[in-house]
Amino acid sequence: MAQELKLGYKASAEQFGPRELVELAVLAEQHGMDSVAVSDHFQPWRHNGGHAPFSLAWMTAVGERTERVQIGTSVMTPTFRYNPAVIAQAFATMGCLYPGRIMLGVGSGEALNEIATGFQGEWPEFKERFARLRESVRLMRELWLGDRVDFEGEYFTTRGASIYDVPEGGIPVYIAAGGPVVARYAGRAGDGFICTSGKGMELYTEKLLPAVAEGAAKAERDVADIDKMIEIKISYDTDPEAALENTRFWAPLSLTPEQKHSIEDPIEMEAAADALPIEQVAKRWIVASDPDDAVEQVKAYVDAGLNHLVFHAPGHDQRRFLELFERDLAPRLRALG
């Protein structure tokens, strides 16, 4: 059965402090969003004006203040500064508190967050980071069965470990992928798949989504059962100049993947990002002041097969964005589903 079209809100933990970020999630539910997803950074991508509240504390606060939205990370790295057994316990607890509403979105990690918190040695290449991710997911799922777990992995070990409070069925795990290797893994092992917009439609139509389908087929799964989430970078405002200028804070998104994965210091990240021209920064975003134009650009992702659209707005006035989204974009987007 095909997944229904869902509209979500990206809570930008790099841009807002914890109390404001909770209030924005509450507003997102009030404005009709189906989900709220939060980034999980120890350090932001900007030193000046940046924030980095702890995602799990935020999720619990949002759970207490909301009634229906799905709440999750997009994304967390459960492999370096975190012990995946403890992450499994934390998410199981939230799953008991807010049944059916919690998801865990995971990725392979960035040096910015892990080296500051004590990772020693050379930052690992993709092969090791991916192996750690797979092993952590396997361990967390074993723990969510509620049994005593003796786990002997290459990177993680448990001895008679049990999680005593686990929601029935465990916690859905969403795998973030920027290329076909991890996308195949998402199809094979993920309850959901996460990607981000603005990288050329052929990436989604020719690489990522076919890889998800290939992974699902190899695991004898129905790819239609996998929630296909995309973070859509959208700067929508009825004022065209504001729509363009609002992207400036998020210039780090326009750095190369190598820069984003290897830069260790937010001051260095900020300097590299601020050297970029606004035109290059804006290329990662749907920048629009006409609602039909905005929805037409989003529609391409729906047509590609992505069903869970999580909207990341770059401006500081998120209340305005949520009001405009509900008024101008949501009705048009719902009609696509």
UniProtKB/Swiss-Prot annotation:
Substrate binds at T196, K199, K260, R284. GO terms for molecular function: coenzyme F420 binding; glucose-6-phosphate dehydrogenase (coenzyme F420) activity; oxidoreductase activity, acting on paired donors, with incorporation or reduction of molecular oxygen. Keywords: Carbohydrate metabolism, Oxidoreductase. Its EC number is 1.1.98.2. CDD domains: Tetrahydromethanopterin_reductase. GO terms for biological process: carbohydrate metabolic process. It catalyses: oxidized coenzyme F420-(gamma-L-Glu)(n) + D-glucose 6-phosphate + H(+) = 6-phospho-D-glucono-1,5-lactone + reduced coenzyme F420-(gamma-L-Glu)(n). InterPro entries: F420-dep_G6P_DH, F420-G6PD/mer, F420_G6P_DH-rel, Luciferase-like_dom, Luciferase-like_sf. The active site is at H41 (proton donor), E110 (proton acceptor). The keyword Oxidoreductase applies. It comes from the Bacteria. The keyword Oxidoreductase applies. It holds the Pfam family Bac_luciferase. Coenzyme F420-(gamma-Glu)n binds at D40, T77, S108, G109, N113, G178, G179, V181, V182. Transmembrane segments: none annotated. PANTHER family: 5,10-METHYLENETETRAHYDROMETHANOPTERIN REDUCTASE (PTHR43244:SF1), PTHR43244. Belongs to the F420-dependent glucose-6-phosphate dehydrogenase family. Catalyzes the coenzyme F420-dependent oxidation of glucose 6-phosphate (G6P) to 6-phosphogluconolactone. Homodimer. This is F420-dependent glucose-6-phosphate dehydrogenase. It comes from Rhodococcus erythropolis (strain PR4 / NBRC 100887).
